[in-house]
């Protein structure tokens, strides 16, 4: 049976300055998925990022964390998609989401970029917004002037625990989401409640 999701991309910024920051939630998810499958992401120049191919839960998935900066993510995503002839609708892009509380996640198909530079560049390079998104909640600082410092700030202990819990839940629903049962996966994931 054809897979609905063939490629999972984690948006983030490269380098130790950005490790474990809220803005790197997507990249942290893809690292966790690779670990779950017993694989390690390795540098791959032709895809401008860290790459692994995994066989997991009956799925054959290409994992990519672009090593470009966030606002150039589309370069890496397009390079990998073009090489393996993966269509945009078969791509799941995991990214941090200010408009969701920490420890929650939502699956979404299509839509705008909502001011997220990684999504903006992905849409520009793919020439469409018709790809799937995994929105990982990081919360909002409450003041739009504080957003940059907030997203580039490091995750606290409780936030890390909440992200780990939601990553586990995403991994439970991903096989359904990738194999034609997106509605069921969304229902389960969207009803997941973070630990207080």
Swiss-Prot record:
Catalytic site positions: 23
Single GO molecular function: peptidyl-tRNA hydrolase activity
Gene Ontology biological process terms from the UniProt entry: protein quality control for misfolded or incompletely synthesized proteins; rescue of stalled ribosome
Subunit structure, interactors included: Monomer.
NCBIfam families per the UniProt record, alphabetical: pth
HAMAP family noted in UniProt: Pept_tRNA_hydro_bact
Protein name: Peptidyl-tRNA hydrolase
